Amino acid sequence: LLSEVLKRWQGSDDDAAAASASFDDADVTAEEEEASVDTPPQYSGRALAENSQFVTFLRHCRRPHDPPPNLVVYADPIGLLREFGRDNTGIKIAMATFPALGVDGLHAVGFTSTVAVDRFDGLNHMHLLLGNPRAGVMQVIAAEPGDTTPPPFVFDDLESYLTWNWNFRSSFNTIRALVDRFQFEGRTDRFVKESISERLGLDFEKDVIDNLGGRVVWMIGYEQPARFRGQQNTLALSVVDEDAAARTLATFVAKYADKFEERRFGDVTYQRFKIEWPEQFQEDPPTDPFLAVMDGYFLFGGSCQLFERAIAARDGTIPRLADDPAYQHLAIEVEQEVPGVTPVFWSYSRSEETLRQWYDLLTSPKTRDFLAEHSEGNPFFTALVESMEAGELPPFEVLAQYAAPSVGIIYDTDSGYHGIGFSLRANVEPTSP
């Protein structure tokens, strides 16, 4: 490996070959020379830039008019496994199953990052290089292009909004075919019936899989007032038949009636989990989970408070993310960067809300009292308490200007899945659509 690196560093093939030969021949015994005849070469001698997979990756992950990325990460996972498992029988046996599983369709994965380029504060690209046609486990990834507009129940002051479109029936069928192939025919159906359907009191395939519409919405936000366990998640799955989804939920709740408490907010009825938390969690419980069916979605999450904010956003009593100018600005930039592309995945993050959470925690009386009680013998806590007492923390508005929102998408290409993510420089005006 060192020989190959030096060869390219020097830039002269003739000189590099001589240097390589002298490097290789130094201190080689007769026994080592004889053994080397039967040892296959580890390196092809080609530069990485001549690798067709790397060339394909870089073509997708670097815009032609941009300078070279500040960071490039590239890996061939199967190749790495093959090299590291050269003398490992277990790895060799596992790799022998890769063609049947379709794992050998994963050719490479790479990532590039460029800082302060063009209109962007940071611009990142990712590419998952897949073979064609995709087979086996690669077909489990059943992401599909579709609508990524935030539904009306997505409120604007969340930390992250993620959404994607997925063919659940296709994924389920692929998993069933793979499991049955390596175990026995009907293994998956037996497991689903005995371990899921009978336990939940429903037909999992008919009532759940076949009623999923394919749209997934994931919201991450913070409860108010700020607390250490305030970050909570809400997941929403679109359904084909809302009435059928409501009946499925009612069947499940009836089976475990003692575990739920019915609640109502506005015109929405939902189920709150009844959990007896240990004493140490009663004042600050980790979660307050719920289940609900609303507006063509099945929703579940870790905070009733955040769900009620979602209802309020749907009803128009608090701002919605889709109407937020910062979100609209980044959505326009995405359209300009990849015109005509319909993503399979979309993410939007507001680091301002993360910063607000920790700022509110640090400045709350409860946190100040905690730090004061535990500052003795702790230089960091002591310095923090002294800074807050001296009023050295700047106003939140000063800090917030350095927390720009960011956006990221993933879309399907002929060579695999490509992702792009960025945040904009300060004071960048929206591009004309």
Question: Which residues does each PLM region occupy?
Answer:
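Extracellular/lumenal glycan-associated surfaces
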Residues: 231-241, 297-306, 422-424
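Long, K/E/R/D-enriched contiguous segments that form extended
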Residues: 158-272
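Short loop/beta submotifs within extracellular cysteine-rich repeat domains
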Residues: 2-4, 81, 243-244, 306-309
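Hydrophobic or amphipathic alpha-helical targeting/insertion segments
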Residues: 1-19
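Leucine-rich, highly hydrophobic segment in Treponema pallidum outer-membrane-associated proteins
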Residues: 5-6, 19-178, 211, 215-218, ...
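Conserved RecA-like P-loop NTPase helicase motor core
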Residues: 1, 287-303
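Short, Gly/Ser/Thr-enriched beta-strand-loop segments that form substrate-interacting elements
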Residues: 269-286
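A common structural junction motif
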Residues: 13-16, 254-262, 318-319
